[in-house]
Amino acid sequence: MADLSAQDKLKQICDTLREETLKPAEEEAGSIVHNAREQAKRIVEEAKEEAQRIIRSAEETASQTLKKGEAALVQAGKRSLENLKQAVETKIFKESLVEWLDGVTTDPGVSAKFVQALVQTVETQGISGNLSACIGKHVSARAVNEALGKEITSKLKDKGVVIGKFSGGAQLKVEERNWVLDISSEALLDLLTRFLQKDFREMIFQSC
């Protein structure tokens, strides 16, 4: 019994030591674990928030980049369409107009009518002076003079038309006034282009 009593005392001493030393340590360890878990939880939450922020930022950047890319594509498309329109105008409108004007204004009969109209216009306006009539370089001066007749050629300084540097049509110079009345093929091309180009664009590109 004495031995058991001694054992009981030893156990009691051990229990007391455990409570006094181990229990606070266990409580401290538990507190450390709890704090570590809370800190880990906060770190995880912060990491999630940072990840979401990075994702949102990436999405915004991608969206902006996409919008810029789309805007660039739209602008490039507009430029391409405008270049195409200009190419079509040059090929179909201007080249066809040049070809048509060259065919019409290099005809001696047409050139003669131009010269006659210019001379009559000057006379109607009461303008006097030395008149020089030029015709296109691809037109026969002899054929034009024959078509005009002496009634008109006699009013010209050179008693007939002279060859100019332009393709077709005619010019009348009033030397004293330094005037040039110009209905050459080049002048007509510029005039018709300015007046007809808008209508041509609307007709050809109205659905573009």
Curated annotation (Swiss-Prot):
GO terms for cellular component: proton-transporting two-sector ATPase complex, catalytic domain. The keyword Ion transport applies. Disulfide bonds: none annotated. It comes from the Bacteria. GO terms for molecular function: ATP binding; proton-transporting ATP synthase activity, rotational mechanism; proton-transporting ATPase activity, rotational mechanism. GO terms for biological process: proton motive force-driven plasma membrane ATP synthesis. Pfam families: HrpE (PF06188). Keywords: ATP synthesis, Hydrogen ion transport, Ion transport, Transport. Belongs to the V-ATPase E subunit family. Produces ATP from ADP in the presence of a proton gradient across the membrane. This is V-type ATP synthase subunit E. The gene is atpE.
